[in-house]
Amino acid sequence: MSIRIVPKEQLGAQREKSTTAETIPPLLFANLKSLYSRRAERLRKLATDNPLGDYLNFAAQLAEAQHHALHDNPLTLDLTEELQQGAASGKPPLDLSVFPRSEHWHKLLVSLIAELRPQAPEHILAVLDNLEKASSHELELLADALLNQDFGKIGSEKAPFIWAALSLYWAQMAGLIPGKARAEYGEHRQFCPVCGSIPVSSVVHIGTVSGLRYLHCNLCESEWHVVRIKCSNCEQTRDLNYWSLDSELAAVKAESCGDCGTYLKILYQEKDPQVEAVADDLATLVLDAKMEDEGFARSSINPFLFPGS
């Protein structure tokens, strides 16, 4: 099973059919007021004594720029039609493969560039200049390449900036959904029920959803529930193993599946309440190297590190 978003008017009929399993919140939308500033803070903390410290600090600057760009470029959008179509077809309402993008994300990119310029070193400035000079058509081609995972068509130096703007755009749209929709169970649980993208990592929460695992979308920043002890990629339960660099009590582990040969990191807030889906994944690339040595392929993509980067 997976999660499907339905229009608000369908809630009454669904409540009559509710089960115990459905009392678990199937979908969590991001708190955009603090998401990017918290991510930037976490990245800076993790950069200390980390071999990838310089890149983590760069990622922190980009996350901070996202925080400001979000504030400076509010979005108003009626998603009623998209919700109705998604509910009828069983597809995500903000399906990245077919959703008609507006040029709002171009404005977000311009804001990101303006925020990053004052601190950017020369090699980053050259990339920002190139992106700023790109036509709308060229930007859309770059976006298509990233969203379709055709990474050979976009330079690895441009990818994080394009994705940062696209992610902001999708996160803003996702933030408009909660008052109009809820989630129910369906199929294709390995994909985000909001936009159809893939996770960056998974988080076992504390608080009101304590002990529950949620996959964190690498595009729209939403999180969706997937039960533990089940592969998030193929849903098998037979051959799961958990790997860590430090000890069994590590806050970041890799969950590997012998059936499909993939792995996804799992972050435990009970071990460290400050873990963050994107930051802690990026800061533990040594664990990725270990998993590759063991013959497992990563089933996720970090928005700061695309294949070929």
Curated annotation (Swiss-Prot):
Cited InterPro entries: FdhE-like_sf, FdhE_C, FdhE_central, FdhE_N, Formate_DH_accessory
Alphabetical keyword list: Cytoplasm
PANTHER family: PROTEIN FDHE
Protein function: Necessary for formate dehydrogenase activity.
SUPFAM superfamilies to which the protein is assigned, alphabetical: FdhE-like
Protein name (Swiss-Prot/TrEMBL): Protein FdhE homolog
One cellular component (GO) term of this entry: cytosol
Pfam families listed in its UniProt record: FdhE_C, FdhE_central, FdhE_N
Keyword Cytoplasm: yes
Family designation: Belongs to the FdhE family.
Entries under Gene3D superfamilies matching the protein: FdhE-like domain
Gene Ontology biological-process entries: protein maturation
The UniProt record lists the keyword Cell membrane: no
GO molecular function, one term: ferric iron binding
Annotated localization: Cytoplasm
